[in-house]
């Protein structure tokens, strides 16, 4: 064992963490950025929370890193309590050791299956954070029901991004009841949100995303639960299908039904709230969280100013029109000079969000080459 620091929290973790042994406690240091962002986003949500008690659940605790950081680093004037569960007895033991290490008394630990823990706590938690290895689908139904408190928050990670991005089409259809679209990684998180919205709607619950990102090998989203059939209907109105023709996307409303050649359904509405993103960015900066977490939040802050589903991949676009790829910064400057909004995206070094049309980009790239060469 070794002791490390993440954010403002000390953690005892295995020297080597692996999923190959049944009794091994899993800790992934690569996900520190994920946890930095998560604490920042939940803090932004908590800043507007009006009740005296705030109850959270991390039902897939592992080493306890996520739940313990919530318990230790979130600032709240009322009573903040965190429930952490894991089916692995070795994990439960480590979680308890990490609680002692940080002298925390606001955490309850459960040696229990995640679905059992969540099902026992119907409508109890203000926040449920599903962070599995693989797909969140097996835990989603019980996670939704456990976070049905008024204005609750459902956080969800999927590490099966190859499935969500279309590498395993049949698996995606089977697990997420949707046809994936290859290419744009943002569509992975939109597909995941779309599935969650459909799952929640059967309980007359609407899910409203307030923050989403696709980083490394995972997709992550934070969704507010809103009670009422009307809220569920409003959430479903944001679902739709996408058809990709060359570099151009066509859209079709969910209520119109599926049509051959389209993929989805995807959540086509806003997936990150501008105020939440900005507040999360300020929190991450003020707490000196990792530079990478701050950089991702800064990019998402700029992205959220532009209403575009997905992005334009300049590398793919130039390949399609048979032009050399100009420096991305030059393309951005040209777009701004022509009165368009533009931002890089956090998940693709060649990706741009802009209110320009595809035809505008083609013209600007062609003009760039005619002047340059």
Swiss-Prot record:
Q: Which UniProt keyword terms apply here? A: Methyltransferase, RNA-binding, S-adenosyl-L-methionine, Transferase, tRNA processing, tRNA-binding
Query: Any idea which GO molecular function terms this record carries?
Result: tRNA (guanine(26)-N2)-dimethyltransferase activity; tRNA binding
Protein residues bound to S-adenosyl-L-methionine: 35, 66, 86, 113-114
Which reaction is the catalytic activity of this chain?
Answer: guanosine(26) in tRNA + 2 S-adenosyl-L-methionine = N(2)-dimethylguanosine(26) in tRNA + 2 S-adenosyl-L-homocysteine + 2 H(+)
Identify the EC number(s): 2.1.1.216
> Pfam family example for this protein?
TRM
Trm1 methyltransferase domain location is: 2-365
Provide the top EC class.
Answer: transferase
Q: What does this protein do?
A: Dimethylates a single guanine residue at position 26 of a number of tRNAs using S-adenosyl-L-methionine as donor of the methyl groups.
What protein name does the entry list? tRNA (guanine(26)-N(2))-dimethyltransferase
Its source organism is Methanococcus maripaludis (strain C5 / ATCC BAA-1333)
Q: Which gene encodes it?
A: trm1
């Amino acid at each position: 064992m070794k002791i490390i620091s993440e954010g403002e929290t000390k953690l005892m973790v295995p020297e080597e963490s692996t999923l190959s042994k049944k009794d091994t406690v899993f800790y992934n240091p690569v996900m520190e950025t994920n946890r930095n962002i998560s604490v920042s986003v939940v803090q932004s949500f908590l800043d507007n929370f009006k009740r005296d008690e705030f109850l959270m659940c991390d039902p897939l605790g592992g080493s306890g890193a996520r739940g313990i950081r919530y318990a230790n680093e979130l600032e709240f004037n009322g009573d903040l309590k965190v429930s952490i569960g894991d089916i692995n007895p070795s994990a439960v033991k480590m979680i308890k050791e990490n609680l002692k290490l940080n002298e925390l008394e606001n955490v309850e630990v459960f040696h229990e299956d995640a679905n059992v823990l969540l099902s026992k706590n119907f409508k109890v938690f203000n926040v449920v954070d599903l962070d599995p290895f693989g797909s969140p689908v097996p835990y989603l139904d019980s996670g939704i029901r456990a976070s049905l408190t008024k204005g609750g928050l459902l956080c969800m990670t999927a590490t099966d991004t190859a499935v969500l991005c279309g590498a395993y089409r049949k698996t995606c259809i089977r697990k997420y009841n949707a046809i994936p679209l290859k290419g744009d990684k943002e569509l992975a998180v939109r597909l995941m949100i779309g599935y969650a919205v459909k799952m929640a709607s059967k309980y007359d619950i609407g899910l409203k995303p307030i923050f989403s990102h696709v980083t490394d090998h995972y997709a992550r989203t934070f969704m507010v639960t809103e009670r009422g059939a009307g809220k569920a209907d409003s959430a479903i109105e944001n679902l739709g299908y996408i058809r990709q023709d060359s570099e151009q996307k066509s859209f079709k409303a969910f209520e119109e039904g599926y049509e051959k050649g389209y993929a989805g359904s995807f959540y086509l509405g806003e997936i990150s709230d501008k105020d939440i993103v900005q507040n999360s960015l300020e929190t991450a900066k003020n707490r000196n969280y990792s530079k990478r977490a701050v950089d991702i939040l800064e990019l998402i802050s700029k992205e959220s100013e532009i209403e575009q589903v997905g992005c334009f991949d300049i590398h793919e676009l130039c390949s399609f029109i048979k032009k050399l790829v100009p420096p991305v910064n030059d393309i951005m400057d040209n777009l701004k000079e022509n009165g368009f909004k533009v931002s890089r995206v956090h998940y693709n070094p060649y990706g741009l969000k802009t209110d320009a049309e595809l035809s505008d980009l083609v013209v600007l790239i062609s003009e760039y080459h005619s002047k340059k060469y």
